[in-house]
């Protein structure tokens, strides 16, 4: 465990050092007195801002194809930064882009700042992207210096992913069940990044806690492990002196994250699945002021033809009595303004997020409601001669859902419901195997989590390739041609065959240039010393014997 060196002194005893808090970990009392809360931000809003910033980093990094370690590192930077600064001073989306930009360089998966900003622009609306100012790149670059000074240049961060895979290899039992447990625990780690667990506990303890939670939900009790005789519980071989209460507290914090999504799911599904019924009650709200639309319609009817009026009467008989006037689309703007204004007033008076989410959820999925309006256009087109005038009005009705956020005085209070929709699919080259970006925070993910809690054999994806060692495959044996029958592998190879112009005896005699025995020996004089042949003068020199001393000196 890394200790806080700033707060420790040499005089502190070893017993006190064991209880010294790590430099990047706080208790719940400290988390209740963050700079944001000291400036008047309530804890629920701060938790929502942290969740939205983490999901923003997760979604941007996933679309850019970054590794899960890079995403987790950026989110850890994000949480640590706001332990020293307030959300009111530093917008969360600019900080999230800066943290992802720095994490990419630290984890050796860098991305250009303009690419991060471009991806952020595709995820945020105009009001949310307005936090980046006129020069988004300059905003990120300036904030990077503040981020580095805030985290004290402590850039290396460990994550529960590596410990989760390491611990899973030490478990014994059914491999399929262990694989399901690891897959589920991996998803819990992804979702735990949206909480402050990384500011409370080490990654080793979080890895054990998510395995404990996954085992409880999968109804898989870990009974066999490698060091079972030495330890009473399976997690004691990985982390010691961790009681069950700590694991239970971590599990409850993760489940509380899903309980918030469960409360908002009933408001989220009707907007997507039951869009036509939601369009019908809208004209019912202003039934009292129907006289105003009727006056507007009467004012617009004189320049029209009688055929148009007859067509309108036919539509009124064919359709429900709730939709008798298809033309009051201009007054419909005033109706929506009346409906939106009380919501804004309620939001100004009630800071908790639940009243905001139903309204915001309709801003992000504009694609599903784009299909019902074409069903309503055909009855209006034959009835009205000026279809071009009605078309833009109805198309403007769709962006009207996005108009309320700009009217809001505080743009920070208009976040996208990122935690309540599944992240975008990663590119094909992102991971070969399990999708490491899975989450139970979306509507579909929470339903699958509920089904897994009821059934014993849930369906999971494949494990990441690094979770278990791959099967050892013997190397392929090369198919050489069989040796000839007379081949002797122990016999030394023959000497290289030289060209025919160089005649070399096949087996030269031992020695250095010794003549053969039949060579006639030279004659030896009586003195015993063989005569020395005269030296051969170099070419162009006169014989030495013809030169005397006097001639040589000349």
UniProtKB/Swiss-Prot annotation:
SUPFAM superfamilies (UniProt xref): Cyclin-like
Compositionally skewed regions (Pro residues) per UniProt: 402-428, 466-542
Disruption phenotype: Complete embryonic lethality. No homozygous embryos are detected at any stage of embryonic development.
Phosphoserine modification, residue list: 325, 329, 341
Tissue expression summary: Ubiquitously expressed. Highest levels in testis. Present throughout the seminiferous epithelium. Also highly expressed in the developing oocyte.
Superkingdom of origin organism: Eukaryota
GO biological process: cell division; DNA damage response; in utero embryonic development; negative regulation of stem cell differentiation; positive regulation of transcription elongation by RNA polymerase II; regulation of signal transduction
InterPro entries: Cyclin-like_dom, Cyclin-like_sf, Cyclin/Ssn8, Cyclin_C-dom, Cyclin_N
GO molecular function, one term: cyclin-dependent protein serine/threonine kinase regulator activity
Predominant place of localization: nucleus
Localization of this protein: Nucleus
Pfam family, one: CycT2-like_C
GO cellular component: cyclin K-CDK12 complex; cyclin K-CDK13 complex; nucleus
Quaternary structure and interacting proteins, as annotated: Regulatory subunit of cyclin-dependent kinases. Identified in a complex with a kinase and the RNA polymerase II holoenzyme. Interacts with POLR2A. Interacts with CDK12 and CDK13. Its interaction with CDK9 is controversial.
PANTHER family registered for this protein in UniProt: CYCLIN
Family under the similarity heading: Belongs to the cyclin family. Cyclin C subfamily.
Role description: Regulatory subunit of cyclin-dependent kinases that mediates activation of target kinases. Plays a role in transcriptional regulation via its role in regulating the phosphorylation of the C-terminal domain (CTD) of the large subunit of RNA polymerase II (POLR2A).
Record protein name field: Cyclin-K
Annotated source species: Mus musculus
Organism placement in taxonomy: Eukaryota, Metazoa, Chordata, Craniata, Vertebrata
Gene: Ccnk
């Amino acid at each position: 465990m890394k200790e806080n060196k700033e707060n420790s002194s040499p005089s502190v005893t070893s017993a006190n050092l064991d209880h010294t808090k790590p430099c990047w970990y706080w208790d719940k009392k400290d988390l209740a007195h963050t700079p944001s809360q000291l400036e008047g931000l309530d804890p629920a809003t701060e938790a929502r801002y942290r969740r939205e910033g983490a999901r923003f980093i997760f979604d941007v990094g996933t679309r850019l194809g970054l590794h899960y370690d890079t995403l987790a590192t950026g989110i850890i930077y994000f949480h640590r930064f706001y332990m020293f600064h307030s959300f009111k001073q530093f917008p969360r989306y600019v900080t999230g882009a800066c943290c992802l930009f720095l994490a990419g360089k630290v984890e050796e998966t860098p991305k250009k700042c303009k690419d991060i900003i471009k991806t952020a622009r595709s995820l945020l609306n105009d009001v949310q992207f307005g936090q980046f100012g006129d020069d988004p790149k300059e905003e990120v670059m300036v904030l990077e210096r503040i981020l580095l000074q805030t985290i004290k240049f402590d850039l290396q961060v460990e994550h529960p992913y590596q410990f989760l895979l390491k611990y899973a290899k030490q478990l014994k039992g059914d491999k399929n069940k262990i694989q399901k447990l690891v897959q589920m625990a991996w998803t819990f780690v992804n979702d735990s990044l949206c909480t402050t667990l990384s500011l409370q506990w080490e990654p080793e303890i979080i890895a054990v806690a998510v395995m404990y939670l996954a085992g409880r939900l999968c109804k898989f009790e870990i009974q066999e492990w490698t060091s079972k005789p030495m330890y009473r519980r399976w997690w004691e071989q990985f982390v010691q002196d961790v009681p069950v209460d700590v694991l239970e507290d971590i599990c409850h914090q993760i489940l509380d994250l899903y309980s918030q999504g469960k409360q908002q799911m009933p408001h989220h599904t009707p907007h997507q699945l039951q869009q036509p019924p939601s369009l019908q009650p809208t004209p019912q709200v202003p039934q009292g002021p129907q006289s105003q639309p009727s006056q507007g319609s009467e004012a617009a009817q004189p320049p029209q033809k009688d055929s148009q009026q007859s067509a309108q009467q036919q539509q009124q008989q064919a359709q429900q009595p709730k939709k008798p006037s298809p033309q009051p689309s201009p007054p419909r703007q005033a109706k929506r303004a009346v409906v939106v204004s009380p919501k804004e007033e309620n939001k100004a008076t009630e800071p908790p997020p639940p009243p905001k989410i139903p309204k915001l959820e309709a801003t992000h999925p504009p694609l599903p409601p784009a299909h019902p309006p074409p069903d309503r256009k055909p009855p209006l087109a034959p009835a009205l001669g000026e279809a071009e005038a009605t078309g833009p009005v109805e198309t403007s009705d769709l962006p009207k859902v996005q108009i309320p956020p700009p009217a809001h005085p505080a743009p920070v209070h208009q976040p996208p419901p990122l935690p309540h929709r599944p992240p975008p699919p990663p590119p094909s080259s992102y991971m070969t195997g399990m999708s490491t970006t899975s989450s139970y925070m979306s509507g579909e993910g929470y339903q699958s989590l509920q089904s897994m809690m009821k059934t014993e054999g849930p369906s999971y994806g494949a494990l990441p390739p690094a979770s278990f060692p791959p099967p050892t495959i013997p190397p392929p044996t090369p198919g050489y041609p069989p040796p000839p029958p007379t081949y002797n592998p122990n016999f030394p190879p023959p000497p290289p065959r030289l060209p025919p112009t160089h005649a070399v005896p096949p087996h030269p005699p031992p020695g250095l240039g010794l003549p053969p025995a039949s060579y006639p020996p030279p004659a030896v004089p009586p003195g015993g010393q063989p005569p020395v042949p005269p030296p051969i003068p170099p070419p162009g020199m006169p014989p030495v014997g013809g030169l005397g001393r006097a001639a040589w000196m000349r």
